[in-house]
Curated annotation (Swiss-Prot):
<feature type="signal peptide">
    <location>
        <begin position="1"/>
        <end position="18"/>
    </location>
</feature>
<protein>
    <recommendedName>
        <fullName>Allergen Ste b 1</fullName>
    </recommendedName>
</protein>
<comment type="subunit">
    <text>Homodimer; disulfide-linked.</text>
</comment>
<comment type="similarity">
    <text>Belongs to the ALTA1 family.</text>
</comment>
<keyword id="KW-1015">Disulfide bond</keyword>
<dbReference type="Pfam" id="PF16541">
    <property type="entry name" value="AltA1"/>
</dbReference>
<dbReference type="GO" id="GO:0005576">
    <property type="term" value="C:extracellular region"/>
</dbReference>
<feature type="disulfide bond">
    <location>
        <begin position="121"/>
        <end position="133"/>
    </location>
</feature>
<dbReference type="InterPro" id="IPR032382">
    <property type="entry name" value="AltA1"/>
</dbReference>
<keyword id="KW-0964">Secreted</keyword>
<feature type="disulfide bond">
    <location>
        <begin position="67"/>
        <end position="82"/>
    </location>
</feature>
<keyword id="KW-0732">Signal</keyword>
<keyword id="KW-0020">Allergen</keyword>
<feature type="domain" description="AA1-like">
    <location>
        <begin position="28"/>
        <end position="137"/>
    </location>
</feature>
Length: 137
């Protein structure tokens, strides 16, 4: 899950949330999003040329869509829009499977969130180094 905070100009990595029944989760002022269906392709086994994931609100919100980007070589730490005319964008950090997600709500409000997306890669079939990566629970 991703956690977002309003009004941040820069983001620092958040620690992984622990799923303990005794740990209360505050929802007032926080937005909690679930990331699923992560997939990506590394044509040379070292860099991504496509990334895709689903993002969904978990606090009775309406957010539920697929975010994706494709290029000859997707650059780490560069923000890519989730779609045409979208207020949402993401950046990826390959070395730690880190997702940085940003939603520009207004001139004064930006939600920023981070998550680590565990995944596994297998042979892709488009060459000896081509791999396809998918999210792992």
């Amino acid at each position: 899950a991703l956690f977002a905070a309003a009004g941040l100009a820069a983001a620092a990595p958040f620690e992984t949330r622990q799923d303990y029944a005794s740990c209360p989760v505050s929802t007032q002022g926080d937005y909690v999003w679930k990331i699923s269906e992560f997939s990506g392709r590394k044509p040379e086994g070292t860099y991504y040329n496509s990334l895709s994931f689903n993002i969904k609100a978990t606090n009775e919100g309406t957010l539920d869509f697929t975010c994706s980007a494709q290029a000859d070589k997707l650059e780490d730490d560069k923000f890519y829009p989730c779609g045409e005319n979208s207020s949402m964008s993401f950046a990826f950090q390959s070395d730690r499977n880190g997702l940085l997600f940003r939603q520009d709500v207004s001139n004064d409000i930006t939600y920023v969130a981070t998550a680590t997306l565990p995944n596994y890669c297998r042979a892709g079939g488009d060459g000896p180094k081509d791999v396809i990566c998918q999210g792992a629970s």
